[in-house]
Every structure is written in structure tokens, then in C-alpha cells.
Curated annotation (Swiss-Prot):
<feature type="transmembrane region" description="Helical">
    <location>
        <begin position="8"/>
        <end position="28"/>
    </location>
</feature>
<keyword id="KW-1133">Transmembrane helix</keyword>
<feature type="active site">
    <location>
        <position position="351"/>
    </location>
</feature>
<feature type="transmembrane region" description="Helical">
    <location>
        <begin position="136"/>
        <end position="156"/>
    </location>
</feature>
<feature type="transmembrane region" description="Helical">
    <location>
        <begin position="105"/>
        <end position="125"/>
    </location>
</feature>
<dbReference type="InterPro" id="IPR045378">
    <property type="entry name" value="LNT_N"/>
</dbReference>
<dbReference type="InterPro" id="IPR004563">
    <property type="entry name" value="Apolipo_AcylTrfase"/>
</dbReference>
<dbReference type="Pfam" id="PF20154">
    <property type="entry name" value="LNT_N"/>
</dbReference>
<feature type="transmembrane region" description="Helical">
    <location>
        <begin position="507"/>
        <end position="527"/>
    </location>
</feature>
<feature type="transmembrane region" description="Helical">
    <location>
        <begin position="206"/>
        <end position="226"/>
    </location>
</feature>
<dbReference type="Pfam" id="PF00795">
    <property type="entry name" value="CN_hydrolase"/>
</dbReference>
<dbReference type="GO" id="GO:0042158">
    <property type="term" value="P:lipoprotein biosynthetic process"/>
</dbReference>
<dbReference type="GO" id="GO:0005886">
    <property type="term" value="C:plasma membrane"/>
</dbReference>
<dbReference type="InterPro" id="IPR003010">
    <property type="entry name" value="C-N_Hydrolase"/>
</dbReference>
<protein>
    <recommendedName>
        <fullName>Apolipoprotein N-acyltransferase</fullName>
        <ecNumber>2.3.1.269</ecNumber>
    </recommendedName>
</protein>
<keyword id="KW-0812">Transmembrane</keyword>
<feature type="active site" description="Nucleophile">
    <location>
        <position position="405"/>
    </location>
</feature>
């Protein structure tokens, strides 16, 4: 292995870039649906050795010194995001006549852009690089900053953050109840990269001991927390039915199918309860499951009232339209409705975090002049974004915190208001992406939000994966991908949070400071020894 490390260190030019790409591609295997945890323990040491091989000439200008580490980081990121996000292209094939031209931009262009974040990560790391275990701290620092920025710059896209690879199952998710994803990103990179010290690096014992301690604490805390009694059912008990209709996206886009789609949802809503289950108090339909503007269809509301039993509530995704005033086109919102047993809309919440190019077109005036449009181009201006996300109060007083579609991948979306709710709600339609890694990755990331908030999650997905997840991230009941049907269960209760959002943010910045100090001191010592 030492010989292999030496060969990787000596690589240069295209060979070094290609190995960086392969290392990033390998790292994808640590994410769902593969969950091959060991892959990260190979890919990140390779990245360390590639950076070890960068020896810029002090006489070079700043740009020439930055290019080699930036190229390594970008190639690693390009491989990682290409291997992890290729399935986004499926959405463009649903209406291939209109959007197939954009496949290269989505499948190759987006990973190329996202790779710039990892280029920054490696540039930061290389500026603090040394020959000891401090360089592992430098790499963790660089990735921590890059992933933090990826979470909010340009609307944010923290999909497949490195930290998720360290949390493949509920046993290893419990740290998210103490620290935020940004902190886990940093510590995960430290642990994943530490094996590089076995063959190359001074102070290997110290670095490996810290990594082993972090990994042991991560797993041991999971064992401890899952050994505690499971959250008791919410009192008074509330039985939830989640509907998973499995409707092909092409059918959803066909206006002629609207009535049959609506009736399909109603038939699943009225299906007999499963063995041992109580009559549902709340029925949940997926995102955009109501295939028309509900407020323009009183007959549809009457049909819902016919199907719902006394006291039942329907929570369903739909497009909501709002009059914008004289002479202006109406505003459309991707929304969730609360409908009571009389067919009355008694609550609604609109999506806050829209998907660029999917639900709206950034720089619309400029890009439409170039002939571009969003997937939601059938609505003038696309969807509008809500400014706030309310906690929805259901008839009877129960409260839910709605997250529509990919809003559930943003850890920061689960703010203090989420703790006011009895349950998190995630409704989505992943039929756009077909039977690919995308829906599995989406579900895994949503699952973590329940752990962070200490609050159970109800998840309804058109084609799957639908589930009820308890406050520890444990699946209470689940309906796998492409299985049509319903799931009925009693909603579990909440758990006390061990730290609040402000404390988790403070821990992140404290960890950032510690890693910087370790890397900077190690770098200083390296410079002194070298001179």
C-alpha cells in the first residue's frame, strides 16, 4: 500500500486529474442506494495522496500555484457529482421533445459547476498543507467550508453532502441530534481521510487516534440512543394513512388523465384499513397529487367530502393560484392543502425553496430571450416562492411542519418552528427521476430531518419512498419504490432535543476554528522544519 501511495503522489498532469476523477466517482458508492461505507475510506486517502504530490514553485504567481490543487479538487468533485447526480437527466426525458437538448447541461454541466466547490475545498486545504496529521485537519476544514457554502450559495444545493455518507443507517444518524450537518461534513472527511496517515505522514498515531475516537463516539452514541425506549405514540393517538399512487409522470402531464388520477387517489383513501390498524385520522397525498386548480373545482371538493369519514382530514399537494391584480398574470404556488370532512380548505402552505430551472427560471427575462424555459413553463412565470413556511394546524389541534419536495434536503429549513409541530411533513413527486438512485438519496436525506428535529416525519411520495419515520430516524412503516398502496400507522411522539439550532451553529464554528488552528500550527511547524 505504501508503494501505491507513492505512485499516486508522483502522478502529475492528466494522470493526476483522472485519478482524482476516479476517486470522486468511487466516493459516490458511500451514498444511497449503495451505502458502501468503506468506499469513502479509500477515495479520501487517495485524495490526500494526490494533494501530497502538489509541489508548486515558490517563484510562480498565485494563479499558477492555485491551479494544481484546484484541478485535483475539481476533478474529484466532478466525478463525485457526475456519479451521484446523473439521474437528474431523467426529468428532461419525460418531455424529451422540449427538454432533451438540455441533457448535457444537466448531466455534465451541473457536476462541472458543483465541482468548483470541491476545487475551493482543496485550495483551502493545500494552503495549510503539511506532512503531518494536520493536513487531514486542513482537508476537513476545506470541505467543511465548501459544503457550508454549497448549502446556500446560488439558492443552495446541498444534495449528497459528504456527511450523509457517514450516516447510512439510523444507528449512525444519532449524532445529528447533537451537531448539525455542516459539522458532520467536516468530521466525516477527517475520519474518511485519516487512513492516508498509515502509509504517508508524521504524527500518524495522533491523527488515527482522533479519527478512531470520533468514529467510536459516533457509533457508540447511536447504540446508546437506539437502546432507549422508542418514542411513545403521540397522545391522544393519531392514526395516519399515507397514499402512494405510483402514477407515471407522463400520465400526470396528460390533461385527459386528470379525472382518473384524482379518482385513483380517492379510491386509495377509501381503501379498508390494514390488519390491526385504526381508522385513519389524517390522510396524506403526495406533492401535486390534485391534478387541477382545486379552488376552481367545487365538485372535486365535494368528492373529497364524500370519501372522507367524519372527523378525517386530508393533507394533499396541489397547485394553488392567486390573483396578482389587474393586468398581471396570476401567481402559481406549489402548495399543500388541509381539507376537512366537509370538503372545506381549512389550511394551506406554499413552497418556499423552489427548484431553479424546474419550478422557475432564474434571470427569466434574459434567458427567455435566448429561448430557454423552465419545466414549469406551462404556467406564466413558473411558480412563485412563498416568503415564510407556517406550521399548519389541523382540525383537532394537531400541528404539522410542511416541506415540499426537495425542501427536505436543506437541514437549515428545519428551524425552530419545526419543534412547534407534532410531525414534519414531506410530500414529493419523484416520478420525474424514475427508478434511479435519486429517490433513494432524497428519502435518506429527508430521514435525517426527523433526527435533527427530534420530531417524527410523515412522507408521501407519488412513486415512493413513502414512510413514517420516528424521531430517531427509525422507519415505523415504509412503502418501497414503485409499490402502489397505502400505509396506516399510529404517529409516534417527539423526543427532547439535546441541543438547539443556535448551539449547533456555535459547535460548527468552534469545530471550524479548532481545525484551522491544528492545520495552521502544523503548517507553521512544517515550514520551520523545511527551512
Amino acid at each position: 500500500m505504501e508503494r501505491l501511495a507513492g505512485r499516486i503522489i508522483l502522478l502529475s498532469g492528466v494522470s493526476r486529474t483522472f485519478v482524482g476523477f476516479l476517486a470522486g466517482l468511487l466516493a459516490v458508492l458511500a451514498q444511497p442506494p449503495f451505502g458502501i461505507f468503506a468506499a469513502a475510506f479509500v477515495s479520501f486517502p487517495v485524495l490526500v495522496w494526490l494533494i501530497d504530490g502538489v509541489a508548486p514553485d515558490p517563484g510562480d504567481g498565485l494563479l499558477r500555484r492555485l491551479m494544481p490543487p484546484a484541478a485535483i479538487g475539481w476533478s474529484f468533485g466532478f466525478g463525485y457529482f457526475l456519479g451521484g447526480l446523473w439521474w437528474l437527466g431523467n426529468a428532461l426525458l419525460v418531455e424529451a421533445d422540449a427538454f432533451a437538448w438540455a441533457l448535457p447541461l444537466t448531466v455534465v454541466g451541473l457536476p462541472a459547476v458543483l465541482g468548483l466547490f470541491y476545487a475551493l475545498a482543496v485550495v483551502i486545504a493545500r494552503s495549510l498543507w503539511s506532512d503531518g496529521w494536520g493536513r487531514i485537519a486542513a482537508l476537513a476544514l476545506g470541505f467543511g467550508i465548501a459544503e457550508w457554502l454549497r448549502g446556500f450559495l446560488f439558492t443552495g444545493f446541498p444534495w449528497n453532502a459528504i456527511g450523509y455518507a457517514a450516516m447510512p443507517m439510523p444507528l449512525m444518524m444519532q449524532s445529528a441530534s447533537v451537531v448539525n450537518l455542516s459539522t458532520i461534513n467536516m468530521l466525516a472527511v477527517f475520519v474518511f481521510a485519516a487512513p492516508a496517515l498509515i502509509w504517508t505522514g508524521k504524527g500518524a498515531r495522533a491523527g488515527l487516534a482522533i479519527a478512531a475516537a470520533l468514529f467510536t463516539a459516533h457509533v457508540a452514541f447511536g447504540f446508546y440512543r437506539l437502546a432507549q425506549p422508542a418514542p411513545a405514540p403521540l397522545q391522544p393517538e393519531m392514526t395516519v394513512r399515507v397514499v402512494q399512487p405510483v402514477i407515471d409522470q407522463a400520465k400526470k402531464l396528460d390533461d385527459r388523465e386528470r379525472a382518473s388520477i384524482f379518482e385513483d387517489h380517492l379510491s386509495l383513501t377509501a381503501a379498508p384499513v390494514q390488519d390491526g390498524a385504526k381508522r385513519p385520522d389524517i390522510v396524506v397525498w403526495p406533492e401535486t397529487s390534485i391534478p387541477f386548480i382545486l379552488t376552481d373545482n367545487p365538485d372535486a371538493l365535494a368528492r373529497i367530502a364524500d370519501v372522507l369519514q367524519d372527523g378525517q382530514v386530508l393533507v394533499a399537494g396541489a397547485v394553488r393560484v392567486e390573483d396578482a391584480g389587474a393586468g398581471l398574470p396570476p401567481r402559481y404556488y406549489n402548495s399543500v392543502y388541509v381539507i376537512d370532512d366537509r370538503g372545506q380548505i381549512v389550511g394551506a402552505a406554499d413552497k418556499v425553496h423552489l427548484v431553479p430551472f424546474g419550478e422557475y427560471l432564474p434571470f427569466e427575462d434574459l434567458l427567455t430571450s435566448w429561448g430557454l424555459s423552465s419545466v414549469a413553463a406551462s404556467m406564466p412565470g413558473g411558480f412563485s416562492a412563498a416568503s415564510t413556511r407556517p406550521v399548519l394546524t389541523l382540525p383537532g389541534g394537531r400541528r404539522i411542519y410542511p416541506m415540499i419536495c426537495y425542501e427536505a434536503i436543506f437541514a437549515d429549513e428545519v428551524d425552530g418552528n419545526a419543534r412547534l409541530a407534532d410531525a414534519l411533513l414531506n410530500i414529493t413527486n419523484d416520478a420525474w427521476f424514475g427508478d434511479t438512485p435519486g429517490p433513494r438519496q432524497h428519502f435518506h436525506q429527508a430521514q435525517l430531518r426527523a433526527v435533527e428535529a427530534g420530531t417524527p416525519m410523515i412522507r408521501a411520495a407519488n412513486t415512493g419512498i413513502s414512510a413514517v419515520v420516528d424521531a430517531r430516524g427509525v422507519l415505523v412503516v415504509v412503502l418501497g419504490y414503485n409499490y402502489r398502496g397505502v400505509i396506516d400507522t399510529i404517529l409516534p411522539g417527539k423526543l427532547p432535543t439535546l441541543t438547539n439550532i443556535a448551539t449547533r451553529s456555535q459547535i460548527f464554528w468552534l469545530t471550524t476554528g479548532i481545525l484551522f488552528l491544528v492545520a495552521a500550527i502544523s503548517r507553521l511547524g512544517f515550514n520551520i522544519r523545511k527551512n
